Design a protein with these regions (language model features):
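Sigma70-family region 2
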Residues: 16-17, 43-44, 54-71, 90-93
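Structural recognition of an alpha-helix C-terminal capping motif at a helix-to-coil junction
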Residues: 50-57, 70-82
Length: 188
């Protein structure tokens, strides 16, 4: 069986036994997700990549602490989120760039590109105003597709707290995005 076809639990056990290739496979599986979470916290791809690398190295150093009865992905993403939060506290990084999951799949025309940039900027600004835990919860839930229970495990908070954070984040995002839609309709 090729390494990429091996279940997370088996790869994690092999990584705990010192198999770096197994750990590398796990990192590859969750790297994009981990980077998006780091970017939601930090706001730009360069800092997010650095925080993700910090988190991946910290997870490798502490692989022995991983509980094989729990999912590996949320464990790794939580470590990356903690690394991103540490980096943000140290550098006081502000969100300044676009959020990549919002990029469109098709090639848009110039007017559509401008509209998408304006929407992204409005969303970025609104996300930047949210408390960090709400921002991470709403990105994990609405962008990454995590369940409330998975987010609770990742963030180390009760599931009810996650539900509340997602609710309040969505409510906080609703007004700025509605204002953007109203502006867009007037422009049309």
């Amino acid at each position: 069986m090729r390494t990429k076809d091996v279940p997370d639990a088996e790869l994690a056990a092999r990584a705990q036994a010192g198999d770096r290739e197994a750990y590398g496979t796990l990192v590859m599986r969750y790297a994009a997700q981990a980077r998006r979470v780091a970017r939601a916290i930090l706001g730009n791809p360069e800092d997010a990549d650095d925080a993700a690398q910090d988190g991946f190295l910290a997870a490798l150093r502490h692989i022995g602490r991983y509980d094989p009865d729990r999912p590996f992905g949320p464990w790794l993403v939580r470590i990356v989120a903690n690394a991103a939060a540490d980096r943000r506290r140290r550098r006081k990084v502000r969100r300044t760039e676009e959020l990549s999951p919002l990029a469109a799949a098709s090639a848009p025309g110039p007017g559509e590109v401008t509209d998408r940039r304006a929407l992204r900027a409005a969303l970025e600004a609104a996300l930047a105003e949210l408390p960090e835990r709400q921002r991470v919860a709403v990105v994990l839930f609405d962008v990454e597709g995590y369940s409330h229970a998975e987010i609770a495990g990742t963030l180390g908070v009760p599931e009810g707290t996650v539900r509340s954070d997602v609710f309040h984040a969505r409510r906080a995002l609703r007004e700025p995005l509605a204002a953007w839609r109203t502006w867009k309709e007037r422009e049309s």
